[in-house]
């Protein structure tokens, strides 16, 4: 590490420090694909700075609520990717990647009429380590000493991946004081009757083939 570069096994990676995508001289970098993992630029307009500087494709690490942008969950909808159409794609969110495969199997086999999602989630950088003022009193409490309910966009994000389920799922999150563990609890009302064993058969079947 030095001279604005990281060297790994003889390969040099250049380090830069800019606020906006348009501030970077991407042409000089000879790069045509960018992974945007800032979580800050979540619209076509905010990402336009990349394309104005010769970037051809952008992969965003957070979901974007825009029907023109493909939110991809592998094993569920990656077949929808069209290189000639999708210059921006996202990896959706961690909770959506947890939820979408289950929703896909259940909806395909039993048809989901509506559902409620609860995600038990470790703290993120929107939480605070110490009590401090906040417009949401629950978020004002120390995240490592409290459990507090908050909103989640995962249920709405499912509507981007399964348009026929838009508005049919609702959900909330509970932030809990653990370092790196999460789970998602789902309750669905289904069109077709099922049993525990039949549901497990359908859920386990995709695990026996490559994603």
Regions found by a protein language model. Name each.
Residues 41, 124, 193, 210-211:
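Generic hydrophobic alpha-helical segments
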Residues 101-200:
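Active-site-lining helix/loop region of Rossmann-like oxidoreductase modules
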């Amino acid at each position: 590490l030095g001279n604005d570069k990281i060297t790994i096994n003889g390969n040099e990676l250049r380090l830069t420090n800019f606020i906006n995508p348009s501030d970077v001289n991407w042409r000089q970098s000879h790069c045509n694909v960018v992974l945007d993992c800032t979580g800050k630029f979540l619209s076509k307009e905010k990402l336009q700075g990349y394309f104005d500087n010769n970037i051809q494709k952008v992969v965003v690490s957070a979901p974007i609520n825009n029907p023109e942008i493909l939110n991809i969950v592998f094993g569920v909808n990656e077949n929808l990717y069209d290189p000639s159409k999708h210059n921006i794609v996202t990896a959706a969110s961690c909770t959506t990647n947890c939820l979408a495969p289950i929703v896909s199997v259940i909806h395909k086999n039993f048809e989901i009429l509506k559902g409620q999602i609860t995600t038990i989630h470790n703290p993120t950088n929107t939480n605070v380590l110490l009590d401090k003022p906040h417009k949401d009193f629950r978020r004002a409490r120390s995240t490592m000493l409290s459990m507090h309910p908050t909103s989640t966009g995962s249920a709405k994000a499912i509507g981007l991946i399964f348009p026929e389920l838009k508005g049919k799922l609702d959900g909330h999150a509970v932030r809990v004081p653990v370092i790196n563990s999460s789970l998602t609890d789902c309750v669905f009302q289904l069109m077709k009757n099922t049993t525990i064993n039949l549901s497990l058969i359908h859920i386990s079947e995709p695990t026996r083939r490559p994603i």
